[in-house]
Amino acid sequence: MGANQLVVLNVYDMYWMNEYTSSIGIGVFHSGIEVYGREFAYGGHPYPFSGIFEISPGNAAELGETFKFKEAVVLGSTDFLEDDIEKIVEELGKEYKGNAYHLMHKNCNHFSSALSEILCGKEIPRWINRLAYFSSCIPFLQSCLPKEWLTPAALQSSVSQELQDELEEAEDAAASTAMASAAAGGRTGRHTKL
């Protein structure tokens, strides 16, 4: 039995970038796919794990101050269950790693289109990723932008939390090893020579 859930593309205006590109007729947009009341998106970071993150649907504030919600586009519907979608997103995370992000060749809109094709068999509208199409004409564009503009704040927070968790696990493991060593050392000190 299918769930028949709407698949919605949430589009955000990256107005700080559009100040530069609108004069040549190219809009720059961030996008994410909303399904089951959750929005999945992709962004870059310098680490070899998934760059896919989740925000509250349509909440530009979670992306950062330079993003503004533009519109929601209903793409279709899906019969995948929520658990299936989590597995699909996890699998896509193997391809959409943070350190694989490229503004022109593998960006949030490429991810949104890939997820949309899986969920409802449709690509996102072409105008949303027009920048990638024109990138061969303006290859210098990415080099002109500050790196921090390329990583949404929500993803930075997610990456920071994941790194913090890894650090805490490493510290806990080191503390356990130190305690085990101390305990073992204490036992050997109790032995007396015969």
Swiss-Prot record:
GO terms for molecular function: cysteine-type deubiquitinase activity; deubiquitinase activity; K48-linked deubiquitinase activity; K63-linked deubiquitinase activity; long-chain fatty acyl-CoA hydrolase activity; palmitoyl-(protein) hydrolase activity. One of its GO terms (cellular component) is cytoplasm. It catalyses: Thiol-dependent hydrolysis of ester, thioester, amide, peptide and isopeptide bonds formed by the C-terminal Gly of ubiquitin (a 76-residue protein attached to proteins as an intracellular targeting signal); S-hexadecanoyl-L-cysteinyl-[protein] + H2O = L-cysteinyl-[protein] + hexadecanoate + H(+). It holds the Pfam family Peptidase_C97. Keywords: Cytoplasm, Hydrolase, Protease, Ubl conjugation pathway. Belongs to the DeSI family. It comes from Rattus norvegicus (Rat). This is Deubiquitinase DESI2. Interacts with RPS7. PANTHER family: DESUMOYLATING ISOPEPTIDASE (PTHR12378), DEUBIQUITINASE DESI2 (PTHR12378:SF6). Has deubiquitinating activity towards 'Lys-48'- and 'Lys-63'-linked polyubiquitin chains. Deubiquitinates 'Lys-48'-linked polyubiquitination of RPS7 leading to its stabilization. Exhibits palmitoyl protein thioesterase (S-depalmitoylation) activity towards synthetic substrates 4-methylumbelliferyl-6-S-palmitoyl-beta-D-glucopyranoside and S-depalmitoylation probe 5 (DPP-5). Residues 5-149 form the PPPDE domain. One of its GO terms (biological process) is proteolysis. It is found in: Cytoplasm. The gene is Desi2. Residues 166-194 are annotated as: Disordered. SMART domains: DUF862. It is an enzyme of class 3 (hydrolase). InterPro entries: PPPDE_dom, PPPDE_sf. Its EC number is 3.4.19.12, 3.1.2.22. The keyword DNA-binding does not apply. The keyword Protease applies. The active site is at H30, C108.
